[in-house]
């Protein structure tokens, strides 16, 4: 009988931990939806896939329409190219600036639309549920 009680205590503790984890995840998921990331500018608008020309990207993080200061934003190209720095901190107006270097187009990988993803790494409290935005940059062939 004591073995059964001991087993039930362990099982009950595991259920409580799982429910607690789910509650924390749900809290962070709802909280992440209150943050909005928007692309403010991409310069130049039609970058060349030459592997050298930098593309300046500026994003803004807001919460309920107000700028969010001091959050770490992380940007990564999903299908080609590199970032000068992946992680930037938002300023007092909620802005973060990045420099993206497109890949060099070739016969095997012609110029195409590149998708970049930016995350707000600082919006979660308990579990990592990041606010995120995917956006595209159309690359043109280098001459």
What feature does the model see in each segment?
Residues 2-143:
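The feature marks long extracellular or luminal low-complexity segments
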């Amino acid at each position: 009988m004591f073995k059964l009680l001991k087993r039930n205590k362990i099982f009950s503790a595991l259920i409580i931990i799982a429910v607690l984890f789910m509650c924390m995840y749900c809290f962070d998921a709802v909280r992440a939806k209150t943050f909005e990331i928007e692309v403010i500018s991409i310069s130049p608008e039609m970058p060349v896939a030459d592997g050298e020309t930098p593309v300046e990207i500026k994003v803004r993080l807001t919460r309920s329409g107000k700028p969010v200061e001091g959050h770490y934003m992380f940007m990564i190209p999903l299908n080609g190219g590199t970032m000068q720095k992946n992680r930037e901190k938002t300023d007092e107006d909620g802005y973060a600036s990045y420099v993206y270097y497109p890949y060099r187009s070739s016969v095997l990988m012609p110029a195409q639309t590149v998708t970049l993803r930016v995350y707000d790494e600082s919006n979660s409290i308990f579990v990592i549920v990041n606010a995120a935005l995917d956006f595209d940059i159309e690359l043109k062939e280098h001459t």
